[in-house]
Structure formats: C-alpha cells, structure tokens
C-alpha cells in the first residue's frame, strides 16, 4: 500500500494544505517520505460534519454488524503484513518483536470489543415493570439502556504506535459503543497511522458503514487538535500523552458552551514497594527483574517503575548494588523521537544535579539519540520536602527512596499524586504491613499488584488502566479492557412507551436476547415476557 501523505476523511483521501510534516527515522534522525499534509479548519469541519451525519445511523446498526466491523478492522490490519511492521520500526525505533506483539495486542483488543458488543451486556438493559395496583400511587413502567454519546475525538499516543493509536483502545471502545471517531494522528509515526487508518477505512467500506464513521487527520501544529476538541459536534475525547497536553485539552473542553469529558491518561511514576521480609529474602532476585522492567522499550511505558520505596538497611543496600550492576550492563536504547530523548536527558540531569540525590549507576553509552538507563537514590525526608523529585521522567530512570522505618514509608506514599500502578513485593512476613498499607494504595492507584511490575497491562474484563489525577483525568475510568467502553456511553430512561416504540434491547420478550435486569434481578437470557 503506497503512502501518499493524504488525510482520510470519511471514505475520501484528501491532500492536506495546512503545512506539512515528515516522520523522522528514530535511529538516525533523518526525515522520511512522504510529506504528510496538515489538515485545515475546513478539513476538520468536513470530518466533523460527516461524523455527526453518521452518528444516528451508526449507533443504530445491529450488534452483529458493529461487531463484524471491529473484526474486519483487525483482519485488515493483519493483512498489511510486513509493510506495517517495517514502517513502524523505522518511525519509532522499537524492535520488530515488540511491534509484532503490539499488533497482536491491537487486534486482540478489537476482538474483545467485538465479543462485548455481541453479548450486549454493555447496554445495561434494565426494566422496572409498571405496577398499576401499587398504593398509594401506581408505579410507571420504566426502562433503561445505554446509548453512544456521539462523535469522539481520539489523540494517538507516541509510545504505543498501534495499541494506543489510530486503532487502539480509545478508538476500539468508542466504535464498539456506537460512536464515530475522528483520530488526530501523532506526528511521531504518521506513516504507521496512515496504514492503519486505511485498514479502518477499508473495513468500513466492506461492512457498509456510513462514511463518517472514521476520519484521520494530520496536524502540522497544535491548531487542529485544539479545534477538534472545541468543535460542538465532538462529544468526548480520548487522549494518551503528557500531563501538559492532557490538561490543555481538559481546559479547552471545559471552556466550551457545552463542556465535554476528556479521558486523558497522563503522568505516573508507578511506585514499587519492597517490603522488609521480601527484601531480606529476595533482593538479589528482585533487582534484575526490576531493571528488566525499567529498561523495557527504553522505559517508554506509562507504567514504567520510576520510583522504589523501601526501609533502609543492609538488604536495601544489597538490592541497590545488584540493581546498579544490572543498570550498568544495560545497553543504550533508541527513544521514540529526538524530543522525547532530549526531555529524558533533561529529566535525568535535573535529578542527578539535585543536592539531595545520589546517582548510583548509568547504563552503557550509546549514540546521540539513545538513552542510558539511570538509577538514583534519595532520602525519604528529601523526597517529601522537594516536590520536584516526584515529577515523572519518561524513560529508563528510577529513583530509590530510603525510608528509616515503615511509618516514614507510609508518609512517602501519602505525599504521592495519583498513579496508574503500585507494585508491592512481599513475603509471608509482610502480610500485616501490606494489609495496613492497602487502603492508602487503593486511594493512590488504579491497579495494585504483588510480586510483579506494572509494565504488562493485560487486555481483559478486570483490568483498570487508570487512576487518580494526574494518572488520568477521571479516576472512575479505564482506557484498557472491557470497561473502557463505559466512557463513551450514557444512560437513557424510557417511561410508559408502548412496547413497539421501545428500543429492541428493552422490549418485552427480549428480542435481542441481551442481558436484562428486571426489578434489579438478572433475567434469563432466553426471551422473557414482561
């Protein structure tokens, strides 16, 4: 499939005229062909008009048709074959095996939402039958279902060019909910974005979906992204990226005459707690596992373990020595973009030069675009006193906080902002301490894990990839897993409508055979007769 640099607006490919951008080869810093034309405000208006026109038609497609569309997107992504993998490797500097794994995750995510749509449980169908005999007043007939909120704007992420980008979790869950999607592609991988966008476009055409169900825009500046969030036809936003970028979009959305939600996944340092019994027994085993997680993908994971908390003593110092040795042996790695690399170097330098911080180790040197892993340490009092030590450094750097006792460790945890993950390493003797800490961990993070690291995010029904601000903008939500669909739904209640005028999901007899609750009680999936 030849890359043209065109915008994808509905079923059309249009040459953008508002400036140009080139992908940059991550390993060399050289620009890549073709040039991608930036969208104009007119292009944005066209995409939003198409999405608005498509909304009612698309949200009323049958569950099977919508699920088949999601499955078709996955098939067309797989059909891109090596072309997609090779372009993605060049643009991002990520290894081929990582990209192949991420492609599988992306397609699997689409399949999960297709299964969710076919089941129909996301509709949350509820029926409170009329009770005309109730005294002193009769009860009306009330029925409820979820509907799609409207067209959704999605901002692709830099660090997951497939799974959090054009056909990533935000797009998949919004399409599953019945929302048309307009994606603002990330400038770090426009070629990858264009290939995946064409796959979605082809799937939409194959499945007979309305033209405006999907559009892909490139932006040579920030103008189009900001205008997209401000457009009154957009009803929700999905974003994965920096705290600064997410907060800027939140402000734009809140300032609209009709404010809308921005579901932004932003900043997290993902503390790792090394509890005393585990640290005594397994420090030599935990250290290399920690460094492997820290350096995975050049540390460019939103769940990267950027903070280690432990009670100081011989076991912690032994852990530090083992981890420092592993860091020194870690090869330098290419980062996603020169800008990300420069930001990482600045973040490490700020920590290294801080009077209260000790540099324990750095990884092997590489070229000018490659990142060296870094391990640093500080005291608990310094960490609590200096809020700048709690800033995220995006990349393979982690700060160890030495706590004099468990009470101080608790104080350090209390000083933290919201997190995506908190990992605790514990042995049998640590159970009482963990039990005492768990209420605080629940207040601070969206996912709590034991004897592991947060860098693996399973796509499933029980996953939460979210957390209190600034991990995300809305602590009630997740951007990964089945519950991600809930961000793009809203409930509608129907009172005393004749059965023939009700949506099928909440009709008597349950013609769609979807899960229903009658008077709050799950009803049998076979047709019922209310």
Curated annotation (Swiss-Prot):
Q: What residues make up the catalytic site?
A: 265 (proton acceptor), 302 (nucleophile)
- Binding residues annotated for NAD(+), in chain numbering: 184, 241-246, 392
Q: What does this protein do?
A: Catalyzes the NAD(P)(+)-dependent oxidation of alpha-ketoglutaric semialdehyde (alphaKGSA) to alpha-ketoglutarate. Involved in hydroxy-L-proline metabolism. Prefers NADP(+) to NAD(+) as a cosubstrate.
Question: Which organism is the protein's source?
Answer: Azospirillum brasilense
Q: Which GO terms describe its molecular function?
A: 2,5-dioxovalerate dehydrogenase (NADP+) activity
Pathway field of the UniProt record reads: Amino-acid degradation
Annotated keywords: NAD, NADP, Oxidoreductase
The chemistry this enzyme catalyses reads: 2,5-dioxopentanoate + NADP(+) + H2O = 2-oxoglutarate + NADPH + 2 H(+); 2,5-dioxopentanoate + NAD(+) + H2O = 2-oxoglutarate + NADH + 2 H(+)
Entry protein name: Alpha-ketoglutaric semialdehyde dehydrogenase 3
Family, as annotated = Belongs to the aldehyde dehydrogenase family.
Q: How does it assemble?
A: Homodimer.
| CDD domains, alphabetized | ALDH_KGSADH
InterPro entries xrefs: Ald_DH/histidinol_DH, Ald_DH_C, Ald_DH_N, Aldehyde_DH_dom, Aldehyde_DH_Superfamily, ALDH_KGSADH
Q: Name one Pfam family in it.
A: Aldedh
EC class, as a word, reads oxidoreductase
Known EC number(s)?
A: 1.2.1.26
Q: Which domain of life is it from?
A: Bacteria
Q: What is the lineage of its organism?
A: Bacteria, Pseudomonadati, Pseudomonadota, Alphaproteobacteria, Rhodospirillales
Induction statement = Induced by hydroxy-L-proline.
């Amino acid at each position: 499939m030849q890359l043209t640099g065109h915008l994808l607006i509905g079923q059309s490919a249009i040459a953008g005229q508002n400036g140009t951008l080139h992908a940059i080869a991550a390993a060399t810093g050289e620009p890549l062909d073709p040039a991608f034309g930036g969208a104009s405000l007119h292009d944005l208006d066209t995409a939003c008009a198409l999405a608005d026109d498509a909304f009612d038609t698309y949200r009323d497609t049958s569950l099977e048709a919508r699920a088949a569309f999601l499955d078709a997107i996955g098939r067309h992504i797989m059909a891109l074959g090596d072309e997609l993998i090779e372009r993605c490797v060049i643009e991002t500097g990520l290894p081929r095996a990582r990209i192949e794994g991420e492609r599988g995750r992306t397609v699997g995510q689409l399949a999960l939402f297709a299964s969710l749509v076919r089941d129909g449980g996301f509709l949350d169908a509820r029926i409170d039958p009329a009770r005309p005999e109730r005294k002193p007043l009769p009860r009306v007939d009330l029925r409820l279902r979820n509907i799609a909120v409207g067209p959704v704007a999605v901002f692709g992420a830099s660090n997951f060019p497939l799974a959090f980008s054009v056909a990533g979790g935000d797009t998949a869950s919004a399409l599953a909910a019945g929302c048309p999607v307009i994606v603002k592609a990330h400038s770090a991988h426009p070629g990858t974005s264009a290939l995946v966008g064409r796959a979605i476009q082809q799937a939409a055409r194959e499945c007979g979906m309305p033209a405006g169900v999907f559009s892909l825009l490139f932006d040579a500046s920030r103008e189009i992204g900001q205008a997209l969030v401000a457009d009154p036809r957009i009803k929700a936003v999905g974003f994965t990226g920096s705290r600064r970028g997410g907060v800027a979009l939140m402000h734009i959305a809140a300032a609209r005459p009709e404010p809308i939600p921005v579901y932004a996944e932003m900043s997290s340092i993902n503390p790792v707690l090394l509890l005393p019994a585990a640290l005594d027994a397994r420090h030599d085993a935990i250290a290399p596992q920690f460094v492997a997680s820290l350096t995975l993908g050049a540390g460019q994971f939103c769940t990267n373990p950027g903070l280690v908390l432990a009670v100081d003593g011989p076991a912690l110092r032994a852990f530090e020595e083992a981890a420092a040795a592993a860091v020194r042996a870690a090869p330098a790695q290419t980062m996603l973009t020169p800008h990300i690399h420069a930001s990482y170097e600045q973040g490490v330098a700020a920590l290294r030069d801080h009077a209260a911080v000790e540099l324990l180790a750095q990884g092997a040197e590489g070229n000018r675009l490659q990142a060296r892993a870094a391990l640093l340490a500080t005291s608990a009092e310094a960490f609590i006193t200096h809020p700048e030590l709690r800033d995220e450094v995006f990349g393979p750097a982690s700060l160890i906080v030495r706590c004099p006792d468990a009470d101080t460790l608790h104080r350090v945890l209390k000083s933290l902002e919201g997190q995506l993950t908190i990992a605790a390493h514990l042995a049998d003797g640590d159970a009482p301490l963990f039990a005492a800490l768990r209420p605080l961990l629940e207040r601070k993070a969206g996912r709590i894990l034991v004897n592991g690291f947060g860098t693996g995010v399973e796509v499933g029904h029980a996953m939460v990839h979210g957390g209190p601000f600034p991990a995300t903008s809305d602590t009630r939500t997740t951007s990964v897993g089945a519950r991600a669909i809930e961000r793009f739904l809203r409930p509608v209640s129907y009172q005393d409508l004749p059965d023939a005028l009700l949506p099928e999901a909440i009709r008597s007899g349950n013609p769609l055979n979807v899960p229903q609750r009658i008077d709050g009680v799950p009803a049998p999936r076979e047709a019922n007769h209310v």
